[in-house]
Amino acid sequence: MRFLRLGPSGIRGAVGSALTAQLAIKYASAFGTWLDGGTVGVAIDTRTSSPMFKAACFAGLLATGCNVVDFGICPAPVLHFAVKKLGLDGAMLIGGGHHQGGWNAIMPFSKRG
């Protein structure tokens, strides 16, 4: 089954069948292109698939000329605060939140939120 959702809060789906590393690279590349480079923070949660998606997002962002700051395992409020405090151009949060274990999500946001 392929379940993939794209909305204002990012992209989320079943890991492997809908949400893949290849898709994450494309999604991060689109975000990096939209930001026109700049500095982007990336953070993850503790899901087993999150490091794979972090690596994919790094690849996509770096390919578009972004500088990437690795925040490691970091909750969303801390990442939002860091973007404002450090003057980053945006961030990508990788984490499943309230979704079941086989799902994950990639949530981009700019310095404006």
Which residues does each PLM region occupy?
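Ferredoxin-reductase
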Residues: D36-K111
